[in-house]
């Protein structure tokens, strides 16, 4: 009988800790990141705020999106191994959730990859274009003179 009164106080303590954790968790993202996080949730992505924050921070530091994806994939692979040892039911539920997250990560990384490719190509294009323009102008003048020679022959 003494264990019954202890149970409610124990659950109150646990719920209090959960509330503290929830409050802490909400402070992880700034306003812009929170908006992005809410958009990902609206798109049907289930991801922890802290993981989302890590991904955003890495991408802000110009870490290659593919490297971020591979690191997360490796981390998830490690979780699958540990979850399998704990129980089949939990590993099954997490196994179904992980592909969704990896698809989202690949979408995010491909979107970021396109963005970084555009940025890097825009940075490279002036160098290549100037070199290409010089080659094209000599080729075009050379080809036009050769074509005029062909027509004159």
Curated annotation (Swiss-Prot):
Q: How does it assemble?
A: Part of the gamma-tubulin complex. Interacts with TUBG1.
Among Pfam families, the record links this protein to: MOZART2
Biased composition regions of type Low complexity, renumbered to the chain:
134-153
**Where do the record's region annotations for Disordered lie?**
80-153
The gene that this protein is the product of is mzt2
- What are the alphabetically sorted keywords of the record? Cytoplasm, Cytoskeleton
Just give the chief location class.
Answer: cytoplasm
Q: Does the keyword Repressor apply?
A: no
The similarity comment for this entry is: Belongs to the MOZART2 family.
Question: Where does it localize?
Answer: Cytoplasm, Cytoskeleton, Microtubule organizing center, Centrosome; Cytoplasm, Cytoskeleton, Spindle
**Which ranges are annotated Polar residues under compositional bias?**
81-99, 107-133
Cellular component GO terms, alphabetical: centrosome; cytoplasm; gamma-tubulin ring complex; spindle
| Name of protein | Mitotic-spindle organizing protein 2
Q: Which InterPro entries match?
A: MOZART2 (IPR024332)
């Amino acid at each position: 009988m003494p264990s019954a009164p202890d149970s409610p106080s124990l659950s109150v303590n646990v719920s209090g800790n959960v509330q503290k954790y929830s409050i802490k968790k909400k402070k992880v993202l700034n306003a812009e990141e929170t908006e992005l996080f809410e958009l990902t949730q609206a798109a049907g992505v289930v991801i922890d705020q802290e993981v989302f924050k890590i991904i955003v921070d890495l991408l802000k530091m110009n870490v290659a999106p593919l490297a971020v994806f591979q690191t997360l994939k490796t981390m998830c692979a490690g979780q699958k191994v540990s979850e399998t040892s704990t129980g089949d039911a939990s590993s099954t539920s997490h196994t179904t959730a992980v592909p969704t997250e990896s698809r989202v990560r690949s979408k995010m990384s491909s979107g970021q990859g396109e963005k970084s490719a555009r940025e890097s190509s825009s940075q490279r294009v002036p160098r290549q274009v100037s070199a290409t323009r010089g080659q094209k102008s000599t080729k075009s003048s050379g080809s036009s003179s050769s074509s005029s020679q062909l027509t004159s022959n």
